[in-house]
From Swiss-Prot:
Membrane-spanning segments: none
Protein name: ADP-ribosylarginine hydrolase Tri1
Record function comment: Immunity component of a contact-dependent interbacterial competition system (also called effector-immunity systems). Acts as an arginine mono-ADP-ribosylhydrolase, mediating the removal of mono-ADP-ribose attached to arginine residues on proteins. De-ADP-ribosylates FtsZ, is able to act on other proteins as well. Neutralizes the toxic activity of cognate toxin Tre1-Sp. Expression of this protein alone in E.coli partially protects the cells against competition by wild-type S.proteamaculans.
Entry comment, domain topic: The N-terminal extension forms a projection that reaches into the active site of cognate toxin Tre1-Sp where it occludes the active site.
Provenance organism: Serratia proteamaculans (strain 568)
Phylogenetic classification of the source organism: Bacteria, Pseudomonadati, Pseudomonadota, Gammaproteobacteria, Enterobacterales
Annotated segments matching region ADP-ribosyl hydrolase domain: 74-366
Catalytic activity field: N(omega)-(ADP-D-ribosyl)-L-arginyl-[protein] + H2O = ADP-D-ribose + L-arginyl-[protein]
NCBIfam families assigned to the protein according to its UniProt record, in alphabetical order: ADPriboarghdlase
Assembly notes: Forms a stable complex with cognate effector protein Tre1-Sp.
């Protein structure tokens, strides 16, 4: 095992043992990875279609549609549940306080069941898919702006929590227009894009490559740092497998895909051997992704996964929201504790949005 905060050169040397997880580079692969988020242009037929690498083949749905729907609803509602539980400990040092229920409070003095920016951004993303029938980044950004300025899609009518990188992205979008794509520097690799990932994975459940492309693009709406985009793509893969009925062991097994070194090491599964004091829960996207995978791997039900994640403290709401997406897709909406569902603000609306995304999912088209 290695600490993912080691310098990149050291990590790259260490990661040579996992070189089999990186796909062989080719012109066809480069063409597939080069797309404009404002004008998606993936291959749809002919020779380009036949060149799709095996690792991008969509896994078959192994379960009845009703069970897959339950998992899709679990992913989005689970996100909001984790957010609402984790906010109590947001910004607190680890083990200063603990939670064992949805109690509200925290730095924003929320009521039990109210949630933060994690869920607000996910709802903006879900609504943009439903309105456009695809990922329209400009529409998504406009919905984010309305949340930021007017409190739309918030739990209490106010935008009371927004990350610095997200705020900067929206201000730059308002200043420069739809062609602006920034926040590319490594230090901007926060977790705001992975915490809203679930709608993309639900809508694109029938196409792994569309999941891969849309995950990248939805991140670019605010976060263009490579680790942010790759973390969304990796989480998109995990959710795709789980919504389609794969076991935890299958979904969490190493996948072949092009990833920067820190995400590659998470993909390799080194977190499975780490102890709690080796897991960080900061707002850095790598810390959040690793902590969420670790929490789901080390529990066997939704309830325990969320509490294990939230009680890591620090960026507790985002770690628990990311955990909630994974655990919700694994165990399903029907296995989320009913008392938590009853407390969750706008629970029925969130569940209905997930169902709309599920039934709108386009067929594989290339």
């Amino acid at each position: 095992m290695i600490d993912l905060r080691e310098d990149t050169w050291t990590l790259q040397l260490y990661a040579q043992r996992y070189k089999g997880l990186s796909p062989k580079n080719s012109r066809e692969l480069q063409l597939r990875m080069e797309y404009d988020p404002l004008k998606p242009n993936l291959p749809t037929s002919g020779e380009e279609q036949n060149s799709k690498p095996e690792w991008l083949n969509t896994p078959p749905c192994l379960i009845p549609e009703s069970e897959s729907l339950d998992k899709a609803k679990g992913a989005l509602v689970g996100l909001a549940i984790g957010d609402a539980i984790g906010t109590t400990l947001e910004f607190l040092p680890r083990d200063k306080l603990h939670v064992n229920d949805m109690v509200g409070g925290g730095p924003f003095r929320l009521q039990p069941g109210e949630w933060t920016d994690d869920t607000s951004m996910a709802l903006c993303l879900a609504e943009s898919y439903i309105s456009a029938g695809r990922l329209d980044i400009t529409l998504f950004r406009e919905k984010l702006v309305r949340w930021y300025r007017h409190g739309e899609n918030s739990s209490n009518g106010r935008c009371f929590d927004i990350g610095n990188t997200t705020r900067n992205a929206l201000e730059q979008y308002l200043k420069h227009g739809a062609s602006w794509f920034g926040n590319t520097e490594p230090e901007t690799a926060g977790n705001a894009a992975i915490i809203r990932q679930a709608p993309t994975s639900i809508f694109r459940r029938k196409s792994l490559q569309r999941t891969f492309a849309d995950s990248d693009s939805q991140s670019m709406a605010t976060h263009c740092a490579p680790e942010s985009m790759a973390s969304c793509q990796f989480l998109g893969f995990i959710l795709n497998y789980l919504i389609n009925g794969s076991s935890r062991e299958k979904a969490f097994s190493p996948h072949v895909m092009p990833l920067p070194v820190r995400v590659l090491l998470i993909n390799a599964g080194e977190y499975k051997e780490k102890k709690r004091d080796e897991i960080r829960s900061s707002g850095y996207v790598i810390d959040t992704l690793e902590a969420a995978m670790w929490a789901v791997w080390n529990t066997d039900n939704f309830h325990d996964a969320i509490l294990l994640a939230a009680n890591l403290g620090d960026d507790a709401d985002s770690v628990a929201a990311t955990t909630g997406q994974i655990a919700g897709a694994l165990y399903g909406y029907s296995n989320i504790p009913k008392p938590w569902l009853d407390k969750l603000v706008q629970q029925e609306r969130i569940s209905n949005l997930a169902e709309q995304l599920f039934y709108m999912a386009p067929e594989e088209d290339f």
